[in-house]
Amino acid sequence: AKAFARVEKAKRPVPASYGKDDQDWKRMLERKDLDIVFVVTPWELHAPMGVATMLAGKHVFIEVPIALTVEENWQLVDTAEKTQRHCMMLENTCYGREELLCLNLCRLGVLGELLHAEGAYIHELRSQMNNVEHGTGSWRTPHYAKRNGNLYPTHGIGPVAQYLGINRGDRFDYLSSVSSPARGRELYAKAKFPANHRWNTELTSWVGGDINTSIIKTVRGRSLMMQWDETSPRPYSRLNLIQGTKGTFASYPGRLVIEGETKSTHAWTEGATLETLFKKYEHPLWKKIGDLATANGGHGGMDFIMLWRVITCLRQG
């Protein structure tokens, strides 16, 4: 309803709707006038919808996480190769201003040899549990209760994997992953909902730890630390740290040290001084459309840039 209201407000033609039942989306794939499909649905539908879209001859762009199992990931890869259709995971955090700056710093060699990175998705989202019948919490909450690990890794690992050139000269080798006890969401359910509510009757044994920490080693010997926490009462952060032999950048808040360029290696460069370095090392993509992206919104402009890049790449073949 919200999407249709936006279309009407913009005075654009009302699009076709496919929502008669939970299989009606397959009817949409039968259309001959569709080139690309965006999959923005509950997690468990991402991979099946992606595979079906490519088999129908369309390119597919899938929200994170792109799949829930190793088998589903291989299904997407095999289908993309078989059908020669594009299959892209829509990781918007790779297109934020700070993330693009970091990528440029790394590619220009400003930070020296890259040694270590940190990423995370720390976002207190317990209130989503109030979406019981419809909405994000209605389908995400059971995942938290029944699965343990980092269920949403790519917001943190996506950008730093780009910095390190993962699968472009290096690759992940092995990892060690641990989770804390599962406490926060069970306590929230008991405090906010009656005893006979589905969150207190159907989800009686919560296994997903409140915070997960994973240490990854690459083939070239570099290290990464990844965290995920959508439960604990703490401020938002994606960490976004990249460390090299000549400097380090970290986010939340954005701060930078470059040996021989910033004032000291014992203190972060922040604020107005950092903005000067932003101007010097701004990524070409942000220089090109950063103002337009910011004006159009979407997580500070990153959504706009990601979608702009999708369409631009498709148009250029």
Where are these regions (language model features)?
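Non-transmembrane alpha-helical segments in soluble domains
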Residues: 1-4, 26-29, 51-54, 77, ...
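N-terminal glycine-/serine-/threonine-rich beta1-alpha1-beta2 phosphate-ribose binding loop
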Residues: 1-58, 74, 78-86
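ADP-ribose/adenylate-binding Rossmann-like module
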Residues: 56-69
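Predominantly a Rossmann-like dinucleotide-binding segment in NAD(P)-dependent oxidoreductases
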Residues: 83-88, 93-205, 239, 248, ...
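Active-site rim elements
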Residues: 143-150, 200-203, 228-229, 290-300, ...
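C-terminal helical cap and adjacent loop that interface with cofactors, partners, or active-site loops
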Residues: 161, 211, 232-317
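Active-site beta-strand termini and strand-to-loop segments that position acidic
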Residues: 214-220, 244
